[in-house]
Structures are given as C-alpha cells and as structure tokens.
C-alpha cells in the first residue's frame, strides 16, 4: 500500500512540474507577443501565392552585410551573423 501511495505522489509531483513548465512557457509567449505588439512588429510569416511564395522575417537587428540568402534546390536558406558589441568598447 505504501508503494502505491508513493507512486501516486510521484505522479502528482510530475504533473505539478509539467504544469509549472507549461505556465512559464505561456508567460514567456505572452510577453513576446506583447513586446511585438508594443513595437509594432509582427512575427515571422509567409504566404503561398499561385505562382510565388512570399516570406517576411524580422531582421531589424541585422545590417545587410550580416545577412546571407541562398537557394539550395527548392529551399531558401536565410542566415544571419550578428556580433554584439560589449559595453567596454
């Protein structure tokens, strides 16, 4: 009987841990959404037209020389390398 109670307690503890993790992820998602709305930016998006595909990415923090766009077969690969300057410079 004691093992049964211990197993149930483990399940309850695991459920609490997962719920806590889910709550934290929802909070972060809400903060990101509110931040985008206050900045007037939209999340990355794309749409498929009949003869073309259009994709919009937020690259505000990158300068043009930090971005690379390549095609590889039917794929479009966008990479960005952004060097942050330290406060000591």
Curated annotation (Swiss-Prot):
InterPro entries: A-crystallin/Hsp20_dom, Alpha-crystallin/sHSP_animal, HSP20-like_chaperone. One of its GO terms (molecular function) is unfolded protein binding. Keywords: Stress response. Residues 1-11, 19-39 have a biased composition (Basic and acidic residues). Disulfide bonds: none annotated. It holds the Pfam family HSP20. One of its GO terms (cellular component) is nucleus. Residues 35-89 form the sHSP domain. PROSITE patterns: SHSP. The keyword RNA-binding does not apply. Belongs to the small heat shock protein (HSP20) family. This is Heat shock protein 30A. It comes from Xenopus laevis (African clawed frog).
């Amino acid at each position: 009987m004691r093992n049964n109670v211990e197993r149930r307690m483990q399940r309850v503890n695991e459920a609490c841990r997962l719920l806590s993790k889910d709550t934290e992820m929802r909070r972060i998602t809400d903060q990101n959404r509110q931040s985008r709305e206050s900045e007037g930016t939209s999340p990355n998006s794309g749409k498929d037209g009949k003869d073309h595909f259009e994709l919009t990415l937020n690259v505000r923090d990158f300068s043009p020389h930090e971005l690379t766009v390549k095609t590889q077969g039917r794929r479009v690969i966008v990479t960005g390398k952004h060097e942050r300057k330290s406060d000591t410079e």
